Amino acid sequence: VTKEKLLKIIQAAKTSRRTSLALGDNKIKELPPEIGDLTNLMDLDMSRNELESIPTEIKNLKKLKRLGLNYQKFSYFPIEICSLEKLGELYLRGNKITKVPSEIGNLKNLTGLDLRGNRITHLPVELAQLNYLKLLFVDGNPLVDPPAEIVMEGSETVLNYIRTK
């Protein structure tokens, strides 16, 4: 998808007050700041593109409940996401993320977090603050803390480990 076509898609979604937008598998390298104009969005799926960063304007998507960013080119956790307080599900599988920021603790409504297949070695204690978090997928990371035997037990065991630290 060209930048011009992407801008047209965003403009059409804004005009029609779309609540859901799927732009996966489009070789998108950059998300334009205009994405922040889609203030009615509740579900945004950008999986399988070529994004390396997220524009700060993403913070304007105050109603966003689900964000799919699987299989991008992120080498860091896009901190801008941590201002999306209504976010319930976050998918960042298959990137090159090495660290989850402490600001993840701001996502109080998060129920599911998929971080499989990244390069994360430690999970932040702030994950323990996420009382609604039920599904935490972290396998396929070179985790040191929590240790591999905990990770192999699944979401509930990982969450219990983090919450009792």
Identify the role of each PLM range.
Residues G88-S102, T111-G112:
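A contiguous binding-surface segment within folded domains or other stable secondary-structure elements
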